[in-house]
């Protein structure tokens, strides 16, 4: 059965890009792409018709406009129309290009022919309807932090990936040499996407294990403590997860947390401190940041 999709087109001030991106993700959009259009920025986002009606989309448009007013920026122009499955995949895919991240990785859309030679590690990806194309600052911050963390003796590292989405951080860790990853996501579509991206990158199933669930699911998948934890979810959710992280960690476990806006640094830092974690480094990209943490 084919799905009909809403295509939302949002023409906005470029500085609203990140806020809109997260609003759309929170709303449940699957697949988003953005491009510069003169002085403005055009975001396209897609979601199955069956999940939303006109009223939902009108409410979303109102929220986006309110965000702009609060930020003292011009209101975005929001339009939507229906497209069929074929147009959805070709439209979205044509807007997503290979992207170099850090010094070693190249994110490579699954539908492009693989180059015969690449200086970089090719991370092939078809996120389907899951979050994680590598285009978002928070994913990039996590991949760059992983590159640093896995610089020495990566082959000993077993990593927990909480909120794995498309599986991008698990696959990135394994390409950088990690021993094994265990990913969880509350969204079953993310589990499906992670598994097909694992296969796309020729990674053995036992090296990259994925299940539907959250942090409490991880000990059932791997009963030992993890060497590293990556988690790129919204700050409000991370605050709920931090008190549970010690249960899956050992004294020298490291963590990489993102999905955090700069103004949310303090509550995250306080929660980490209260739960026995120290901040080793804090990296920023635009208004997003990424905590590199270790046990106290
Ligand atoms: C921002 S995406 C990150 C995807 C990918 N790891 C990346 O870095 O691009 C966050 C993911 O976390 C999942 N998620 C949200 N709340 C969660 C929770 N409490 N436990 C596990 N996963 C969760 C969402 O379904 C989504 O796939």
Curated annotation (Swiss-Prot):
The EC number(s) this enzyme carries: 2.1.1.-
GO biological process: one example: methylation
Enzyme class: transferase
Stretches of the chain forming a coiled coil according to its record: none
Reaction(s) this enzyme catalyzes, per UniProt: L-lysyl-[protein] + 3 S-adenosyl-L-methionine = N(6),N(6),N(6)-trimethyl-L-lysyl-[protein] + 3 S-adenosyl-L-homocysteine + 3 H(+)
GO molecular function: protein-lysine N-methyltransferase activity
Domain of life, source organism: Bacteria
Bridged cysteine pairs (disulfide): none
Protein name as it appears in the record: Ribosomal protein L11 methyltransferase
Originating species: Picosynechococcus sp. (strain ATCC 27264 / PCC 7002 / PR-6)
Protein encoded by which gene: prmA
């Amino acid at each position: 059965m084919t799905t009909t999709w809403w295509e939302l087109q949002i023409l906005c001030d470029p500085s609203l890009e990140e806020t809109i991106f997260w609003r759309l993700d929170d709303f449940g959009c699957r697949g988003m792409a953005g491009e510069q259009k003169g002085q403005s920025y055009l975001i396209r986002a897609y979601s199955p018709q069956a999940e939303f009606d006109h009223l939902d989309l009108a409410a979303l448009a109102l929220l986006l406009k309110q965000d702009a007013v609060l930020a003292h920026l011009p209101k975005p122009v929001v339009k939507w129309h229906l497209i069929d499955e074929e147009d959805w995949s070709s439209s979205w895919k044509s807007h997503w290009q290979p992207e170099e991240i850090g010094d070693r990785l190249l994110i490579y859309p699954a539908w492009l022919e693989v180059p015969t030679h690449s200086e970089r590690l090719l991370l092939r990806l078809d996120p389907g309807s899951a979050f994680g194309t590598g285009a978002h600052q928070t994913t990039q911050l996590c991949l760059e932090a992983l590159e640093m963390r896995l610089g020495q003796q990566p082959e000993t590292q077993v990593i927990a990936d909480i909120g794995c989405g498309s599986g991008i951080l698990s696959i990135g860790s394994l390409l950088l040499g990690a021993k094994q990853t265990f990913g969880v996501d509350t969204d079953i579509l993310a589990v499906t996407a992670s598994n097909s991206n694992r296969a796309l990158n020729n990674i053995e199933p036992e090296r990259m294990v994925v299940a539907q669930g959250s942090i409490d699911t991880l000990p059932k998948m791997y009963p030992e403590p993890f060497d590293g934890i990556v988690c790129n979810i919204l700050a409000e959710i991370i605050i709920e997860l931090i008190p549970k992280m010690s249960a899956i960690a050992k004294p020298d476990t490291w963590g990489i947390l993102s999905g955090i806006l700069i103004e949310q640094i303090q509550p995250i830092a306080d929660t980490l401190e209260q739960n026995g974690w120290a901040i080793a480094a804090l990296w920023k990209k635009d208004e997003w940041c990424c905590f590199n943490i270790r046990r106290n």
